[in-house]
Amino acid sequence: MAFLAMDLDVHGHPDLSRRFVDRMAKGLGDPNLHRLIDFYKSQRAQVRGKVGGLRAAEDEVPLRERARSRAEARHRYQWALRYAVAGSEPLVVVIMGRPGTGKSTQAEAMSRALGWPHLASDRIRKTHAGVPLHGRTDAETRERLYTDTLTETTYATLRTRALQRARRRLGTVLDATFSRFAQRERLRTALRAADVPYVFVELTAEDDELKRRLRRRSAEEATASDARASDFEMLTERYEAPDALEDSRHVQIGTAGAPADTTLEILKTLIRRAD
């Protein structure tokens, strides 16, 4: 049963998967089936991933077929992790925090691990403004990029795209500072109204480390972010840090360690919350 439910999800039919599980729970007289099925779907997805991985490692299998098997194995492992993190629901993972905390690095890692798109405010903002995504912007362009109007348009786009995917029962990773309480509250309100699960993952680091990272970023050309070391005090002053009472669906993760360790800690935290 879990194999079929999982395969229906993977092939783009979550509605049929849900209906199938509903019918089975009713037919078996098992009201707890919905609480258990995601565990077994995750396990079955891992089995499919293992089979694909083994096939991809066999020398006698043609190279093209091995590549397909490798891609299929990766896809199934992503599904296994999705079930562990979000069950069968379309979770919205919001990676937020001050500039320099590693939001884009971790959002991209979450995107790769879960197979969900990474929607970054920096890219959306520049796309709306018709500005090249990478490379430094001059003072005049930066002033145009960070008007209140364009900022609200950028965050509205993040909300809209996350909701559009959630209606199709698909998860999303959002990447933005979310420095204002009002920005977070508008997203929360929209997701709650649509009954979409979400979690804010606030990344943190010591001030000295943030300054060091921003100085390093100032020398880079291939970055979509415009935050620089010279902006640190201004950006810190504008940041309205969430407090413990703002939202129970909020976690803090330190980013002092290696990026891969931070990614693992985020995933473990999300899995613990799902339990």
Residue ranges and their predicted role:
Residues 194-214:
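Conserved phosphate-donor/acceptor-positioning beta-strand/loop module used by diverse small-molecule
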Residues 106:
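Hydrophobic positions on the alpha1 helix immediately C-terminal to the Walker A/P-loop
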Residues 50-98:
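ATP/Mg2+ or Mg2+-diphosphate-binding catalytic cores
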Residues 111-170:
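Conserved substrate/cofactor phosphate-moiety recognition/catalytic segment
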Residues 216-265, 273-275:
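Small-molecule kinase domains that catalyze NTP-dependent phosphoryl transfer to phosphate-bearing small molecules
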Residues 168-172, 197-199:
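Loop/turn-to-beta-strand initiation segments
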Residues 1-28, 42-60:
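Active-site activation/catalytic loop segments of kinase-like enzymes and analogous catalytic loops
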Residues 103:
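Conserved lysine of the Walker
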